[in-house]
């Protein structure tokens, strides 16, 4: 890219909601600035905000209006992200802000992702406070979630750096809708990511997400091939929208060919929400068919989610096919992995594992972050 892209400045002191941001350039008209953070490339006049509604042209520079602000903090099981092969059973301090750079009609977190009220992100915390809270709460990791952390990349990156200094892992739960110029700066600070691959056609992304598929595929390929990030993928299957067996076959073949067979794939059930309420939940049979398609394509770790299906929430050894992690909901029932290998046949198990699993279970603990400042 020949144009000069402004990167995030080093600003040690800030007022929440007014942190100067990065990844933008001046437009040729000399009036607008163009946000380069995501593939939309929103051109903003003074006072304008982008599609995400949280990145603003303020006095000729991008300002992150949700930096230091959150819609809430909660300690969750890591499997809820979902990440089934990243320190299983451990607790993760989760938080998000407001806004999103996609416009999914089926969004399950639409009260936050589609919020136009930045003041709804009423809790404030700096990165060091979040890292300290994670340590004091006994959390193995911090997750940037609930809404897409890409649009608050500066806040996520600074928090990830503080967490790394404190010995805490970081997780991005994201759509992967990020530009090439911002991609490495964001993901190089993350230890794990669950990326939503929402469908596998451009028509689906255009009609249901107001976005494009190709940038997501580019992000997934970059994470798998050029980063050390532990990657898992979620595919929410929506009846009549992205549930074609042929499309699922193409998606699974692409994952194996481009990312490798060891990337876990979660097939998640749709429930009517936000604007997409004209159809029922995903039939369990559709999830089971998708599971079988993925196995036949060669994906080694496959899960179902948002349904009661205990058998397909276990982690199976790709060698002997025995369950090396048995689960009941978010509770770990048994753990047969030692030094990254199956204890039954010694085949390697892909993931990031401690010697013993965590014991957080299914608990959900809301956190008042002000108590940790």
What are these model-predicted stretches?
Residues 1-46, 240-373:
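Auxiliary Fe-S-binding modules of radical SAM enzymes
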Residues 35, 44, 53-54, 64-65, ...:
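Generic structural "secondary-structure junction" signal
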Residues 36-39, 53, 98-101, 105-108, ...:
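Cys/His/Pro-rich metal-binding microdomains
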Residues 41-65, 109-119, 324-330, 349-355:
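Iron-sulfur (Fe-S) cluster-binding segments and ferredoxin-like electron-carrier domains
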Residues 48, 100, 201:
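A generic "binding-loop/recognition-motif" signal
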Residues 57-192, 360-370:
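Conserved Radical SAM active-site core
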Residues 124-285, 290-293:
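Conserved AdoMet/S-adenosylmethionine-binding subsite of the radical SAM
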């Amino acid at each position: 890219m020949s144009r000069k892209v402004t990167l995030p400045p080093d600003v040690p002191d800030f007022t929440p909601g007014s942190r100067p941001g990065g990844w933008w350039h001046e437009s040729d008209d000399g009036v607008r600035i163009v946000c380069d953070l995501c593939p939309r490339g929103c051109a903003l006049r003074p006072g304008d905000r982008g599609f995400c509604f949280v990145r603003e042209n303020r006095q000729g520079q991008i300002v992150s209006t949700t930096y230091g602000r959150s819609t809430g903090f909660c300690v969750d099981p890591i499997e809820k992200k979902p990440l089934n092969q990243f320190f299983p059973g451990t607790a993760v301090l989760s938080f998000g802000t407001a806004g999103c750079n996609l416009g999914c009609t089926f969004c399950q977190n639409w009260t936050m992702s589609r919020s136009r009220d930045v003041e709804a992100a009423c809790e404030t915390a700096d990165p060091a406070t979040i890292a300290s809270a994670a340590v004091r709460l006994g959390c193995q990791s911090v997750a940037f979630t609930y809404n897409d952390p890409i649009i608050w990349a500066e806040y996520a990156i600074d928090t990830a750096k503080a967490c790394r200094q404190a010995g805490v892992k970081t997780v991005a739960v994201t759509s992967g809708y990020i530009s090439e110029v911002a991609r490495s700066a964001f993901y190089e600070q993350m230890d794990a990511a669950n990326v939503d691959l929402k469908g596998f056609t451009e028509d689906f992304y255009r009609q249901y997400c107001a976005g494009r598929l190709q940038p997501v595929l580019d992000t997934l390929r970059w994470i798998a091939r050029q980063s050390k990030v532990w990657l898992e993928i979620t595919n929410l299957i929506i009846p009549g929208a992205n549930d074609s067996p042929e499309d699922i076959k193409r998606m699974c073949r692409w994952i194996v060919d481009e990312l490798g067979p060891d990337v876990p794939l979660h097939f998640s059930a749709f429930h009517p929400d936000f604007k997409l309420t004209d159809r029922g939940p995903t039939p369990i049979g559709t999830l089971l068919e998708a599971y079988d398609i993925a196995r036949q394509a060669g994906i080694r770790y496959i899960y179902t989610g948002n349904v009661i299906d205990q058998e397909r929430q276990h982690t199976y050894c790709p060698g002997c096919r025995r369950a090396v992690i048995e689960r009941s909901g978010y509770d770990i029932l048994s753990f047969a992995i030692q030094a990254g290998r199956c204890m039954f046949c010694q085949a390697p198990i892909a993931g990031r594992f401690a010697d013993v699993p965590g014991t957080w279970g299914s608990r959900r603990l809301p956190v008042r972050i002000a108590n940790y400042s």
